[in-house]
């Protein structure tokens, strides 16, 4: 254990700065970055993986800022809700989830049906249709006599007219299980709102609870009619499946309703509709008295009368908590666009600052899109951080530069190059100030973005990439090894001479080449 403790130890997160071998359409590789070039040539450096299972996401899925900062601060792989549920299905524990079993049993005892609703999509952003199939299987295995699916169609995280293919595949899965019927279909536009457009949510409610929609014999027939009317999946008008003119699967008293979206933001409103004791946005005609309402994950702490199949997992002994336990002080600094990431997400989803934790917020510029001002507020952020650390002796400083990600999202190559050059300049200023104070710096990123500005079809690439992030150490003689984002916190603890808690299963990536002097 190294006994030397640099002060301040500084973690700089370059949001959206990925490493990509190809220079073509790579704003990072083609920008003038004398400081980063020098460090990558002459200082200890390595790469950390930022996507897929390495950050708790499914294989091949790009990382994002929220996931990246969770892993950076936790010092362990933080499995996201999608992956938690998928892993539970793979290992069989999903079929024994007590919340699901109790909800199914409650419907059985009341003589009711089990209803599943959610985004029927393989997109993996809000839900996954394979997880809905698993829930059908669970309901069947536990004695549900009637199982109905209320399918919300995607078209945003999937191609705009792909629902026919996915519905066909889903119904083939139902046939193999010998259980479950699609009772209603509508585009996500009508139910998955998050901006209090209650007229849309009401149409989704009335479809499921009252059977108010255009009647069709099958889900695929409803989708084909929508395509014939030039509707895309997201905007498919509410449709109800009927037999002899009557809806086959309205939600009635005694039934159980299970929402199968793992992402919370777009099912909060519809969940409040079905469960709130008092509700003002619209009159809930025919509100069913449910045996149970299950949220796959936690959607909203204010929801009443709900059960949560996969509640949040509390993270203990994360980096910020370890600092507090040792009586050390910290500063978290970012401009508005990434402030929540270096605070809330870096702290494992905790809103309040920890003991000894100060925060510094610099306003992001008020422009329509950041290609109009690619420098953003990087210079002011650097000024404020230098001023703060020169007046207050912090032990740990965490700084996020938002430019590579926020300008990368615009898809404007020239602006992204300017953003990268701005960050390199400000990095030089910040690191000079820290080193002059006797501090050390660890530089990394949460995911890639500006490293690819044009896609394979020649159009603007505005999404994150799967590429690794740099890891650069400005300090003592040492070597760095490749790893993943969850290894950064253990590396910081090693650099600070602090023990790593058992809960952190990441590993330190630093190896000192000579003993430190206390």
Swiss-Prot record:
Pathway assignment: Carbohydrate degradation; glycolysis; pyruvate from D-glyceraldehyde 3-phosphate: step 3/5
Binding residues for Mn(2+) 2: 15, 65, 446-447
Residues given in the record as Mn(2+) 1 binding sites: 405, 409, 464
GO MF annotation list: manganese ion binding; phosphoglycerate mutase activity
A GO biological-process term: glycolytic process
SUPFAM superfamilies, per database record: 2,3-Bisphosphoglycerate-independent phosphoglycerate mutase, substrate-binding domain, Alkaline phosphatase-like
Catalytic residues identified in the record: 65
Keyword annotations: Glycolysis, Isomerase, Manganese, Metal-binding
Catalytic activity: (2R)-2-phosphoglycerate = (2R)-3-phosphoglycerate
Cofactor, free-text remark: Binds 2 manganese ions per subunit.
InterPro entries: Alkaline_phosphatase_core_sf, BPG-indep_PGM_N, Metalloenzyme, PGAM_B_sf, Pgm_bpd_ind
Disulfide bonds: none
Cofactor: Mn(2+)
Positions contributing to substrate binding: 126, 156-157, 188, 194, 263-266, 338
Matches recorded under Pfam families: iPGM_N, Metalloenzyme
EC code(s) of this entry: 5.4.2.12
Source superkingdom: Bacteria
Keyword check for Metal-binding: yes
Single GO cellular component term: cytosol
Family indicated by similarity: Belongs to the BPG-independent phosphoglycerate mutase family.
Function: Catalyzes the interconversion of 2-phosphoglycerate and 3-phosphoglycerate.
NCBIfam families: pgm_bpd_ind (TIGR01307)
Oligomer and partners: Monomer.
Name of the protein: 2,3-bisphosphoglycerate-independent phosphoglycerate mutase
Gene name linked to the record: gpmI
């Amino acid at each position: 254990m190294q006994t030397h403790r640099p002060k301040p130890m500084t973690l700089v997160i370059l949001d959206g700065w990925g490493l990509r071998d190809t220079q073509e359409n790579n704003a990072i590789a083609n920008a003038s970055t004398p400081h980063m070039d020098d460090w990558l040539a002459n200082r200890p450096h390595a790469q950390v993986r930022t996507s897929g299972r390495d950050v708790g996401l499914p294989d091949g899925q790009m990382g994002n800022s929220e996931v990246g900062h969770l892993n950076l601060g936790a010092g362990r792989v933080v499995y996201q809700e999608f992956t938690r549920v998928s892993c539970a299905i793979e290992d069989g524990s999903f079929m024994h989830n007590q919340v699901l079993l109790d909800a199914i049993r409650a419907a059985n005892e009341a003589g009711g049906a089990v209803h599943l609703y959610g985004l029927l999509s393989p997109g993996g952003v809000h839900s996954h249709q394979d997880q809905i199939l698993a829930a059908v299987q669970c309901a069947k295995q536990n004695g549900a006599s009637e199982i109905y699916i209320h399918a919300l169609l995607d078209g945003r995280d999937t191609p705009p007219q792909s629902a026919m293919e996915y519905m066909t595949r889903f119904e083939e899965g139902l046939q193999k299980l010998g259980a479950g019927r699609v009772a209603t279909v509508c585009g996500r536009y009508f139910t998955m709102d998050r901006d209090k457009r209650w007229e849309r949510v009401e149409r989704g409610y009335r479809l499921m609870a009252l059977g108010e929609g255009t009647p069709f014999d099958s889900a695929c027939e409803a989708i084909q009619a929508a395509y014939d009317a030039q509707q895309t999946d997201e905007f498919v008008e509410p449709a109800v499946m009927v037999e002899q003119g009557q809806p086959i699967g309205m939600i009635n008293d005694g039934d159980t309703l299970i929402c199968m979206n793992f992402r919370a933001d777009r099912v909060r409103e519809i969940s409040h509709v079905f469960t709130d004791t008092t509700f003002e946005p619209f009159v809930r005609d025919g509100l069913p008295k449910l045996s149970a309402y299950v949220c796959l994950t936690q959607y909203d702490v204010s929801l009443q009368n709900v059960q949560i199949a996969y509640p949040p997992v509390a993270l203990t002994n994360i980096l910020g908590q370890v600092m507090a336990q040792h009586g050390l002080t910290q500063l978290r600094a970012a401009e508005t666009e990434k402030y929540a990431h270096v605070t809330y997400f870096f702290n494992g989803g905790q809103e309040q600052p920890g003991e000894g934790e100060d925060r510094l917020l610099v306003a992001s510029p008020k422009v329509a899109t950041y290609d109009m001002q690619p420098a953003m507020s990087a210079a002011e952020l650097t000024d404020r951080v230098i001023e703060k650390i020169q007046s207050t002796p912090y032990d740990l400083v965490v700084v996020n530069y938002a430019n590579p990600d926020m300008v990368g999202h615009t898809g404007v190559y020239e602006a992204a190059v300017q953003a990268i050059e701005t960050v390199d300049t400000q990095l030089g200023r910040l690191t000079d100030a820290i080193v002059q104070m006797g501090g050390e710096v660890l530089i990394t990123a949460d995911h890639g973005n500006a490293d690819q500005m044009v896609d394979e079809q020649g159009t603007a690439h505005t999404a994150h990439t799967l590429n690794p992030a740099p890891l650069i150490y400005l300090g003592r003689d040492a070597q760095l090894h490749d790893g993943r984002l969850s290894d950064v916190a253990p590396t910081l603890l090693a650099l600070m001479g602090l023990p790593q808690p058992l809960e952190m299963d990441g590993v330190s990536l630093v190896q000192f080449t000579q003993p430190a002097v206390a």
